[in-house]
Regions:
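Core AdoMet radical
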Residues: 4, 10, 26-102, 106-124, ...
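Structural preference for beta-strand elements that scaffold enzyme active sites
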Residues: 2-4, 82-86, 112-114, 139-141, ...
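Flexible, acidic/Gly-rich N-terminal and inter-domain linker regions that tether
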Residues: 1-48, 345, 350, 358-366, ...
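Active-site beta-loop-alpha junctions enriched in small/polar residues
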Residues: 10, 90-92, 118-122, 145-147, ...
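Conserved strand-turn element in the central/C-terminal portion of the radical SAM core barrel
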Residues: 149, 167-192, 214-215
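Alpha-helix-loop-beta-strand connector modules within alpha/beta enzyme cores
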Residues: 99-115, 162-176, 229-253
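Auxiliary Fe-S-binding modules of radical SAM enzymes
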Residues: 201-415
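Catalytic cores of alpha/beta
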Residues: 124-131, 185-203
């Protein structure tokens, strides 16, 4: 079982400055977006205001983080399996000034540590990587961008790229390194990407996550900061998915992508794919009638599942937003209500106030019932790289059962 150790930190401040491609760069002050956690009669709460910008918490003292770890351990004492501590935060954990002290304290509990996110910008000397591993760090998620000193200086804004790359190599050789690269067309794709993959493969890295660069609102920049980099046009979903497939075939390390996909196990939405119909028998019967509103990427997969189980009382509408969790009020306002049934299911984590979205779906004079579905319906490539197909399938079945529960509850047909 993983215990999250949140060390805090603010993007751009506690990471030695924004990476050139960072989706928090150029963020403008925004009104609260609204979400499921807002009070009933007002828009705005900690999650959909400072929470989404991750501006609320400075780096915490290590003793406070240790207290939180101890509390989590006590609360979960009866659970099976060993504990492992995932150190993460709003900044770059390698920039956390008390990182070695924290890891040492975790090690004294007899626990291993996972550095949940780092670009290595806080590592000025690769000896730090060796010390961290000696103190029990056995897993690292490392944003590499490219095995290229010049590109890391320019795009990651890394003051010591040589030390960072040497640290990544040490982590790969002596622990479990899960690398990541935001792909900027014309910058770190093509031969640069292949050189990076060759390095990771020779070092012994476990996996590489390719992340499509978000540079428009539709791609997920919902904080008023699009474009992050002028003049860069990101790949289409189809082009990016093809790139992930291609790189995965060429190298021995596991290559996944976000927002799509994981070719090794055919994720996400494994149960929607041809040849996997056997898993659909574990879904509940659909007795309600509803419209599911989701993202452009998820819509065809979700639609395929309901078509295969014969749920003709359910239709699926995809908005222009690529990622369902980043849908906002404007995405729902763009929907043609003539295609919407009397009950509507929206993504659980979408950023819109419950009352606001009810008003949006009733603006044509039809009073519709709006409910939220599960937070996720599958597993993103960021997480699936450490999972088997069976583990992802189990999560999908559980999530679709929850979605059908929501349809049957909110879309109960009148007798």
């Amino acid at each position: 079982m993983q215990i999250v150790a949140d060390v805090g930190g603010i993007p751009g401040k506690d990471c030695r400055g924004y990476c050139k491609y960072c989706y928090f760069r150029k963020v403008k002050p925004i009104e609260p977006l609204g979400c499921r956690y807002c009070p009933p009669n007002s828009v705005g709460c900690a999650r959909c205001s400072e929470g989404i910008c991750e501006t609320g918490t400075e780096f915490k003292p290590s003793f406070l983080v240790m207290n939180e770890i101890q509390t989590s351990m006590m609360m979960n004492q009866g659970l099976n399996g060993e504990f492992k501590v995932n150190i993460s935060g709003g900044g770059d954990v390698s920039c956390y000034p008390q990182l070695e002290e924290l890891v040492s304290g975790i090690n004294q509990f007899g626990l291993k540590s996972h550095l949940g996110y780092t670009s290595g910008k806080g590592i000025d000397d690769s000896e730090m990587a060796s010390r961290l591993m000696n103190l029990g760090v056995d897993e690292v998620t490392f944003t590499l961008f490219a095995d290229d000193i010049g590109l890391r200086k320019e795009w990651v804004k890394d003051p010591t790229p040589e030390a960072s790359l040497e640290s990544a190599k040490l982590f790969a050789e002596n622990a479990n390194l899960y690398a990541a690269s935001v792909i900027i067309p014309g910058v770190n794709d093509g031969e640069v990407l292949r050189k990076t993959c060759e390095s990771l493969e020779s070092w012994g890295a476990k996996a590489l996550l390719l992340m499509r660069f978000a540079n428009t609102t539709e791609q997920g920049l919902i904080l008023g900061n699009a474009p992050v980099v002028d003049g860069i046009e990101s790949q289409s979903i189809e082009e990016f998915s093809s790139l992930v497939d291609e790189i995965n075939k060429e190298y021995s390390l596991r290559v996944t992508g976000t927002p799509l996909g994981d070719p090794t196990i055919n994720a996400p939405f494994i149960i929607s794919k041809e040849g996997n119909e056997e898993y659909l028998q574990f879904l509940k019967e659909v007795t309600g009638e509803a419209t599911i509103v989701t993202s452009k990427i998820a819509a065809p997969f979700i639609s395929a599942v309901f078509k295969k189980i014969g749920a003709n009382t359910v239709n699926v509408i995809g908005t222009n937003k690529d990622i369902a969790c980043l849908m906002t009020r404007e995405d729902f306002e763009s929907i043609d209500l003539s295609n919407v049934k009397d009950s509507v299911i929206i993504p659980g984590r979408s950023f819109v106030h419950d009352k606001v979205v009810e008003d949006i779906f009733s603006r044509d004079g039809v009073e519709r019932v709006v409910g939220r579905g599960p937070d996720t319906l599958s597993v993103d490539g960021e997480l699936s790289s450490g999972m088997t197909d069976e583990e992802v399938i189990m999560e999908e079945i559980e999530s679709f059962r929850d979605l059908i529960d929501a349809i049957n509850f909110f879309g109960m047909r009148k007798v």
